[in-house]
Amino acid sequence: MSDLGTSLSLAASGMQAQANRLRHVSENIANADTPGYHRKTISFQELADGTGVETGPVRLDRKALTRIYDPGHPLADETGHYDGSNVDLVTEVADAREAQRSYEANLRMFDQARQMAQSLFDILRK
């Protein structure tokens, strides 16, 4: 693959991986108040051919769930407690911001490679 093609492929796989990461962060934020919900985390791994990255398996954060005291809640046990989620909104917002910035960086790289390819085609056309 040409250097420009490799650049486009790397940037595209980076954007796809960050979009996937942002989707999981969004799910975590949406379920922050869901009783018994465990935060989802993903990791990144390099593609075998070295042309980009992909997201690894989704894992559940096994950190202890928050115990909430609300005797009137339908899920409360005999002591009046139930399990909340282990989602920390500050962490999720920070992860979302990082994923957004990484996506934007890959988008700029993709756009630069596209512009370089277009310039090359314009030169060759003359």
Protein language model regions, located:
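Amphipathic alpha-helical polymerization modules
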Residues: 1-126
